[in-house]
């Protein structure tokens, strides 16, 4: 570093970093988004009159004036051959973590919320750095969707310090969510508040997973749910596996049609996080086996299910009060049983598991009625 600091250098940046780069009068403008380093004391340069500039030689020192100097560490680095430099390791590509970022900062603007005509929910705001120097401050728009948009609109306020993680993208945001002079946005997947007393090295941090590992940041032990800060998408699955009683399990509800097909498979009980099995890493599925979760069944569905149970019990106990259409249904959607007085219909594919062994034997064709 000491050798580099003694050189006279200048850095020229492309318009990607300076929008008004055309007004920079020094040096040649670079059109590609890169930074180049030029040394003014370059060997073989020319002087203003066209003659080649000769390098000045330092005056010879007498032996008495020479002071022993300890070799600089940079000299050994410069002498390193290419064969001694190891090739970076290869890792498997994971689409879920591609362009994934973590941000900690302050909410710069009130959250804007919108419900679109197709039933989708969107919210947006700006997360900013707060620095003593105005020249170093910057902000990034963040977008929420779905239930997380409603959560952000309800709980997030201006000047809150929050942690968000999600996908970084450059695209047009949803309607009424455009922020001038910025195309880079983050589609938030996880949202957390920062504890007021928690130490932070800077008011705004962007850290990748590898940087966290290098800096020695380790996963904290399980704590109360209000103190948990989930930094990455995979941490949500870790928390689910380590604390299954803090999550609702909707897998059976989805199979039975009690919730919509796109409903999350798991949802935290404080409704701050949702997880889908089709987006889970490969290591998650084996660890879910044997875990006990709480199952939340919608109230309206519970009433309907209890009512259905009574109907099946009545069928088993009083089969003569029901028409049995199992033997010759012409319409596949027609009910298998129908009450002779009330007209209530029952389908075998919706029956509880205990019903099938207790059903009466199939009646003869002439005794059945077809609808």
Curated annotation (Swiss-Prot):
What the entry lists under InterPro entries is as follows: NA-bd_OB-fold, Primosome_PriB/ssb, ssDNA-bd
Q: In which tissues is it expressed?
A: Expressed in the floral abscission zone.
What region holds the SSB domain?
97-195
Q: Where is this region: Disordered?
A: 45-64
Question: What is the name of the protein in this document?
Answer: Protein OSB2, chloroplastic
Q: According to the lineage, what is the superkingdom?
A: Eukaryota
Q: Which UniProt keywords apply?
A: Chloroplast, DNA-binding, Plastid, Repeat, Transit peptide
Localization: Plastid, Chloroplast
Region labeled PDF region 1 — which residues? 237-289
Q: Transit peptide from where to where?
A: 1-20
Spell out the residue ranges making up region: PDF region 2: 312-360
Q: Name one GO molecular function term.
A: single-stranded DNA binding
Q: Name one GO cellular component term.
A: chloroplast nucleoid
- Function (record text): Binds preferentially single-stranded DNA. Does not bind to RNA.
| Gene ablation phenotype (knockout) | No visible phenotype.
Query: GO terms for biological process?
Result: DNA replication
